[in-house]
A protein has these predicted regions:
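Core catalytic region of metal-dependent phosphoesterases/phosphodiesterases
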Residues: 6-128
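Conserved beta-sheet core of the metallophosphoesterase superfamily
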Residues: 143-144, 148-198
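A structural signal for short, well-ordered beta-strand segments and their strand-loop junctions
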Residues: 30-33, 93-98, 133, 147-149, ...
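Short acidic low-complexity segments
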Residues: 124-144
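Short gly/ser/thr-rich secondary-structure transition/capping motifs
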Residues: 12, 128-131, 157-161
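A generic local structural motif
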Residues: 16-19, 82, 133-135, 161-167
């Protein structure tokens, strides 16, 4: 699930559709590639402008939690029925790669130390919903495929980017990789010297 960007003012019904898709496909793992929560109240790009007025952190958090409620509703309904019938429940492993939008919380507490302890990633309740979180700019490898919100390059730690991002990722990382962040689909396949496809 790439870059869902749950935010106040947007319809979260799309999360129900994604939850239903998960129930139809029944994957062993569900990986969110980050930016589940948009957190516009913590944006540094347009802070201080008239367009920024009215944004509230609490509303951002409530939108992200509502999105999770909607996403997990089909799974919850399914498992309640299975529990009633004493049948095996479906419990996929859930991975949440934190993205740059979730990192807005960390940056806010670093630039305004008085917020430290008052706000945090835990407000989004990811772990309560069963997600195993992967820190921002970190990766997790499942079945030989590495997942991250984005991959970095160079000493500045900037995101790898390109018009042909799939090609750039396999060329720089030399492994099978999936990332979010760009909001675009791109795919490339290479063959390593040992014959393995990446």
């Amino acid at each position: 699930i790439p870059d869902a960007h749950a935010a106040p003012g947007y319809d979260n019904e799309r999360f129900t559709a994604v939850g239903q898709f998960v129930m139809e496909e029944r994957p062993e793992y569900v990986v969110c590639l980050g930016d589940w929560a948009d957190l516009p109240s913590l944006s540094s790009y347009d802070k201080g402008t008239r367009g920024f007025e009215g944004r509230r952190y609490r509303n951002d958090v409530e939108s992200a939690i509502d999105a999770q409620d909607k996403f997990f509703a089909p799974l919850k309904k399914h498992n309640e029925q299975k529990r009633k019938n004493k049948e095996k429940q479906y419990k996929p492993k859930l991975i949440m790669c934190l993205g740059n939008h979730e990192d807005r919380i960390t940056r806010a507490t670093q630039s305004s130390p008085e917020l430290h302890g008052a706000i945090g990633i835990d407000d989004l309740l990811y772990q309560k919903y069963g997600w195993k979180t992967v820190d921002f700019k970190r990766a997790i490898t499942l079945f030989g495929i590495t997942f991250s919100h984005y991959f970095t390059s160079g000493i500045a730690g900037r995101p790898i980017s390109s018009v042909h991002l799939g090609h750039t990722l396999v060329s720089k990382l030399h492994c099978s990789a999936v990332q979010g962040h760009t909001h675009l689909y791109n795919h490339a396949e290479h063959t390593r010297p040992d014959g393995q496809k990446i």
